[in-house]
Regions:
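Polysaccharide-binding surfaces and accessory modules of carbohydrate-active proteins
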Residues: 1-174
Length: 174
């Protein structure tokens, strides 16, 4: 977030949270849906006390599926105009570095080719700056133990339902 004075310093801190049944809709965006009894949502509110910028994080768990969905609402609660330059969707720390990264890539009429490779030390990035989802790089990644197959094993998967530009960055350190 870049403020009216040109600064890019934001100090958003936790204010409150609530848990409720169901899943809120995301007007104008593709999304998953759930009724009361099918899911529960954790809503976390954080605010920058100086600028009034507000972030509301929504995490929904589904009763019948091993899925957590996440969305964020950003609001300018201050009086000065701001420009949102970038908003990352999540940061996930996995329990091991001994994982393969699975990514889907392609081209027109040859979409969703699977690429699987071991995570390496350093940073790996899969991204698209086309402003829309396309066949070159699918906004999906999975992290699987090397012994995992299509039928068994542990996998952590993430997918943007609505992406535009996206970056999936991984970093392996010691």
């Amino acid at each position: 977030v870049r403020g009216g004075s040109g600064d890019a310093v934001t100090d958003i801190r936790y204010v409150s949270h609530k848990i409720y049944d169901g899943k809120p809709s995301l007007p104008g965006l593709p999304a998953t849906f759930a009724q009361e009894g099918q899911a529960q949502t954790l809503e976390v509110e954080a605010v920058d006390a100086v600028t009034g910028e507000k972030a509301t994080l929504l995490y929904t768990v589904f009763e019948d599926y091993p899925v957590i969905t996440r969305s964020v609402r950003l609001e300018n609660g201050g009086e000065a105009p701001v420009v949102l330059e970038r908003a990352y969707s999540s940061c996930v720390e996995l329990p091991t570095m001994d994982l393969d990264m699975v990514h889907l890539w392609g081209k027109w009429w040859n979409e969703n080719n699977t690429e699987r490779r071991a995570l390496q030390h350093g940073i790996t990035s899969i991204q698209s700056k086309r402003g829309m989802t396309g066949s070159n790089h699918n906004p999906f990644v999975a992290f699987a133990r090397p012994s995992t197959t299509e039928e068994s094993g542990e996998v952590w998967g993430m997918n943007f339902i609505y992406s535009g530009n996206f970056a999936i960055d991984t970093e392996v350190d010691t």
